[in-house]
C-alpha cells in the first residue's frame, strides 16, 4: 500500500510539469515562403518566390574554369616564344645592324611604324634619326651641341644654312655699291688727273706755302676779278683774272698726295696683299688678320694653325669659337670680314 501510495503521486507531478511547460512555451510560427520587398535608396526591390536554379551556377563555374585554362595555355605559349626569340636575335645581329645602318644613312628612308616600336624623331640640324626619349626639351635636336650651333647660326643668319641663290641676287647689288663707296684714298690718287683737278684741296694737306709778295699779288688779282665779275658777266676776262686762274691751276697740279701714315692700316695691308684671297699664303693671312682692329692676338693662332687663303674662306663661326677658342665678339667681326672677301 505504501508503495502504491508512494508511486501514485509521481505521475500527477509529471503531468503537472508537462502542463506547466506547455503553457510557458510560446507558439511556434509555421515557416512558409513569403515574398519580401526592400526599399533601398528610392528603389523597391522584391525578392523572388523561388531560388535560382542550380544548373546556371554550374555553367558559370564551367566558363570560369575554361577561361583559366585558356589563360594558362597563353602564358605557356608566350614563355616558349620568349625563349626562342633571344636565340634568333643572336643569330641575326649582324643583319639587323646592317639594315639599321642603311636606314639611317639613306636620306628620306621611311621610319618603321610598328605597333611596339617607340616613335622616332629627326634632328633639324644634322638629320640624325633616333628615339624620342633621347631628344631634349623641344624634341628638335638630338644633342645640346646641335642646339647651340643652331642658335649661333640664327643669331648671325649666315654660315650654317645655305639660303637660296635667287634671294641673294638682289642684296649683292647693294653690297657692290657699298664697296665702291668705301674705296680707299690711295685708289683715288691713281685715277685720272683731270678728276683730281676738279676735286677741292683738303685743308689737312695744303700745297706749297707762297711767299708774301705772291700773297699780295694774289690778293690784288682777287680784288680785280671781283670787280670785273660785279661790273658785267658778258665782258671778256682781264689779263689779271686770267693769270689768277692760271696760278690756281698750277697750285692744283702741285697738290701733294695724301699722307700714307694717316691712312687706315687695314686698307694699306689689303693693298699690298694679292687681289685673289685664294692665292694668299699663311703669312698673307697673318698680315690680314693682324690688320683688323682687336685681332692682333688672334693672328698668332692663325699662323700656328697654318691657315692659308683657301682655308680662310672656308671658316665658319663654330670653327672660330670651338677649334680656335675665340670669343663671340671677335669671331663675328672676323667672319664678317671673311664674308666680304668671299663676295668680292
From Swiss-Prot:
A zinc finger (FCS-type) spans 114-148. Residues 173-183 have a biased composition (Basic residues). It comes from the Eukaryota. Residues 234-248 have a biased composition (Low complexity). The keyword Iron does not apply. GO terms for molecular function: chromatin binding; DNA binding; histone binding; zinc ion binding. It holds the Pfam family PHC2_SAM_assoc. Zn(2+) binds at residues 123, 126, 142, 146. Residues 1-23, 216-233 have a biased composition (Polar residues). Component of a PRC1-like complex. This is Polyhomeotic-like protein 2. It comes from Xenopus laevis (African clawed frog).
Amino acid at each position: 500500500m505504501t508503495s502504491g501510495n508512494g508511486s501514485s503521486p509521481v505521475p500527477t507531478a509529471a503531468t503537472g510539469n508537462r502542463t506547466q511547460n506547455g503553457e510557458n512555451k510560446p507558439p511556434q510560427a509555421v515557416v512558409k515562403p513569403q515574398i519580401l520587398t526592400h526599399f533601398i535608396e528610392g528603389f523597391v526591390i522584391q525578392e523572388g518566390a523561388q531560388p535560382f536554379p542550380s544548373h546556371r551556377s554550374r555553367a558559370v563555374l564551367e566558363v570560369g574554369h575554361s577561361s583559366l585554362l585558356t589563360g594558362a595555355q597563353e602564358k605557356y605559349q608566350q614563355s616558349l616564344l620568349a625563349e626562342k626569340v633571344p636565340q634568333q636575335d643572336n643569330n641575326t645581329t649582324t643583319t639587323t645592324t646592317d639594315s639599321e645602318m642603311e636606314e639611317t644613312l639613306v636620306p628620306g628612308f621611311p621610319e618603321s611604324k610598328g605597333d611596339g616600336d617607340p616613335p622616332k624623331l629627326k634632328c633639324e640640324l644634322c638629320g640624325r634619326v633616333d628615339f624620342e626619349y633621347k631628344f631634349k626639351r623641344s624634341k628638335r635636336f638630338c644633342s645640346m651641341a646641335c642646339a647651340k650651333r643652331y642658335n649661333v647660326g640664327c643669331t648671325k643668319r649666315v654660315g650654317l644654312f645655305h639660303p637660296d641663290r635667287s634671294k641673294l641676287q638682289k642684296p649683292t647689288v647693294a653690297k657692290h655699291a657699298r664697296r665702291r663707296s668705301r674705296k680707299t684714298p690711295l685708289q683715288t690718287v691713281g685715277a685720272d688727273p683731270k678728276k683730281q683737278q676738279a676735286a677741292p684741296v683738303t685743308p689737312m694737306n695744303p700745297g706749297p706755302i707762297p711767299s708774301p709778295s705772291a700773297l699780295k699779288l694774289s690778293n690784288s688779282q682777287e680784288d680785280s676779278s671781283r670787280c670785273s665779275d660785279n661790273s658785267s658777266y658778258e665782258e671778256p676776262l682781264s689779263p689779271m683774272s686770267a693769270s689768277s686762274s692760271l696760278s690756281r691751276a698750277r697750285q692744283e697740279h702741285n697738290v701733294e698726295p695724301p699722307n700714307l701714315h694717316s691712312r687706315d692700316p687695314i686698307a694699306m695691308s689689303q693693298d699690298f696683299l694679292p687681289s685673289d684671297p685664294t692665292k694668299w699664303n699663311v703669312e698673307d693671312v697673318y698680315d690680314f688678320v693682324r690688320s683688323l682692329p682687336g685681332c692682333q692676338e688672334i693672328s698668332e693662332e692663325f699662323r700656328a694653325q697654318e691657315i692659308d687663303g683657301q682655308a680662310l674662306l672656308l671658316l665658319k663661326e663654330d670653327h672660330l669659337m670651338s677649334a680656335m677658342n675665340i670669343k663671340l665678339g671677335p669671331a663675328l667681326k672676323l667672319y664678317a670680314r671673311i664674308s666680304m672677301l668671299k663676295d668680292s
